[in-house]
Design a protein with these regions (language model features):
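A residue-level marker of the well-folded mature domains of exported/periplasmic proteins
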Residues: 1-31, 39, 43-276
Length: 276
């Protein structure tokens, strides 16, 4: 079918989700319809990608994405081994990352295997998020589904702060955060880790997508954070990511630390262009 058909079907699905969200308290089974619309959107997105790129290009894009993610995990593990050897490390990870699909890497497994023997790895702390595919109707007869929280509701400052406190209570010297950041930028500024002192764990952030604060001010409680290079040139559909993890990482990312911050951050606290 034409790619425009899948775009149209995706638009219908999105429109249905919006309608269900606005009418979930007035319309019976609105949440069930919302889940159905979500499935329609997901299927349409996959079919649109397949129609647009073709099987070969889509597969190439997926493999490149996996290689860059592996490279990121590899270099974070290398940083932890060199800078926090012998310390107690806990990984903060989202629940949906514990059972990765064939198109995703097993972040926890890959990181753990790379730091084994270099640090004391504590039990991971899991940030639970809702998986719509596991939900069952609250009322089997009507088929009414339970309320599905939005990303803003699930990935908020309170939920992250509770998990950071859990990491600290576990006795960790270092928290490696692969769970990302709150969905809302203003929530990111409310995280307790920015106020942690010398007696609190150090934090390694796997990636900061949008920095609505001065990164230089973070490099007290934060041992390091990974950021994308603003001028990285790479065509996911046509290029092939380097097999060497460091080369792949350096192509797209930079690890920012207190030591290299003056060289990689500009006067506004943003990542400089032209980094090698």
């Amino acid at each position: 079918m034409s790619i425009w058909f899948w775009y149209a079907l995706m638009a219908v699905g999105l429109g249905g989700m919006v309608w269900c969200a606005k009418n979930q308290r007035r319309v019976a089974n609105a949440q069930l319809y919302s889940v159905i619309c979500l499935v329609v959107v997901a299927i349409s997105a996959v079919m649109a990608l397949t129609s647009f790129f073709g099987d070969g290009e889509l597969e190439q894009s997926i493999e490149n994405a996996k290689q860059f993610e592996l490279a990121k995990v590899d270099q974070i593990a290398d940083f932890v081994n060199k800078n926090h050897a012998g310390q107690k490390v806990v990984v903060l990870i989202k629940s949906d990352m514990l059972n990765p699909s064939e198109h995703q890497i097993d972040t926890l497994k890959e990181f753990s295997s790379r730091v084994q023997g270099q640090v004391t790895l504590l039990e991971p702390v899991v940030l639970q998020i809702t998986d719509p595919s596991t939900l069952q109707p609250e009322d089997p007869e009507s088929g009414e589904m339970p309320y599905i929280p939005s990303p803003e509701e699930e990935l908020n400052a309170k939920k992250f702060n509770d998990k950071f406190k859990e990491c600290k209570a576990a006795g960790a010297d270092v928290v490696v955060n692969f769970a990302g950041m709150p969905a809302m930028p203003e929530d990111t500024q409310k995280l307790i880790i920015w106020r942690w002192g010398t007696k609190d764990p150090k934090v390694v952030l796997a990636e900061i997508m949008e920095m609505n604060f001065d990164p230089k001010s973070l490099l007290g409680p934060v041992s390091a954070f990974v950021a994308s290079k603003p001028d990285a040139q790479f065509d996911y559909l046509k290029d092939t990511a380097p097999e060497n993890f460091k080369e792949a990482f350096d192509l797209r990312y930079v690890i920012v630390t207190k030591e290299n911050a003056p060289n990689v951050l500009d006067e506004n606290g943003m990542i400089k262009s032209g980094l090698k």
